[in-house]
């Protein structure tokens, strides 16, 4: 007959077993937004990100948040395209954690008047002193919310005891052309790592690596978007990314990561 544990002993063993389940990882990799073209991009992610990390003995967990739309409809810029969303192709990236939410349901909860000023659009239109295209604004809000929900998946793991040194935000629809420069990232844990291209009106926001504390800000920046629009003119993705990085005094490290967005 095995040993019988008293109440205090059972409590101690339970704590020890929970500690055994706690893991420390180098990276949390968050995929966000519509998957769109994963069947054409996933091999580059495997070769240029996952294999590179494994070769460098870096540990990671992958998280994906994406949306479902009415009838699987998707668009490029403001144009609806005939290709429907394939809700199974995400499996090619093998995320450890996956969430699919209703985009239309989310948008119904958003007051677009806080982000897109119709009077400015009517008088000035699409320009730096006017507004961004209305469909791009709604797309961007969905992207930011997807980042937030993806980050909350990571946060849930942290609340259960897991730890992550870095958090990577990455679009699933990019084809990556060179190896992720992991040495440049891990050698600078207090910097925000951004590709050295596609900054436009601010800072590239399609791929970002930050430490966990910085990711708590960056991953939830949608919460400050309406206030930004009040005081800083029209919303543009790169412009707002630069605003947040500057506001919170984050130092940027431009890394050599070349990629192209792959359309369906």
Q: Can you say where each PLM-predicted feature lies in the sequence?
A:
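Short, Lys/Arg-enriched N-terminal segments with co-localized hydrophobic residues
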Residues: 10-22
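Intrinsic-disorder-associated, low-complexity terminal segments enriched in Asp/Asn/His/Tyr and depleted
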Residues: 6-8
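ER/Golgi luminal nucleotide-sugar-dependent glycosyltransferases, focusing on the catalytic module
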Residues: 23-264
């Amino acid at each position: 007959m095995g040993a019988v544990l008293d109440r205090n002993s059972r409590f101690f063993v339970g704590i020890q077993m929970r500690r055994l389940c706690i893991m420390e990882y180098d990276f949390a990799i968050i995929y966000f937004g519509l998957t769109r073209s994963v069947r054409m991009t996933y091999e580059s992610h495997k070769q240029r990100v996952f294999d590179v990390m494994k070769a460098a003995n870096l540990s990671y967990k992958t998280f994906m948040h994406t949306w479902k739309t009415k009838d699987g409809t998707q668009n490029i810029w403001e144009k609806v395209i005939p290709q429907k969303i394939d809700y199974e192709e995400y499996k090619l990236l093998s995320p450890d954690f996956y969430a699919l939410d209703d985009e239309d349901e989310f948008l119904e909860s958003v007051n677009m008047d806080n982000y897109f000023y119709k009077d400015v659009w009517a008088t000035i239109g699409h320009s730096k002193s006017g507004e961004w295209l209305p469909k791009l604004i709604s797309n961007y809000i969905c992207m930011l919310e997807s980042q937030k929900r993806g980050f909350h998946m990571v946060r849930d793991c942290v609340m259960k005891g897991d730890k992550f040194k870095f958090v990577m935000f990455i679009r699933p629809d990019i084809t990556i052309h060179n190896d992720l420069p992991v040495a440049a990232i891990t050698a600078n844990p207090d910097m925000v790592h951004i590709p050295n291209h596609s900054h436009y009106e601010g800072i590239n926001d399609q791929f970002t690596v930050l430490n966990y504390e910085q990711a708590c800000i960056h991953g939830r920046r949608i919460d400050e978007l309406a206030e930004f629009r009040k005081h800083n003119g029209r919303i543009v993705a790169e412009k707002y990314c630069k605003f947040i990085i500057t506001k919170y005094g984050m130092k940027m490290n431009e890394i050599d990561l070349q990629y192209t967005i792959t359309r369906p």
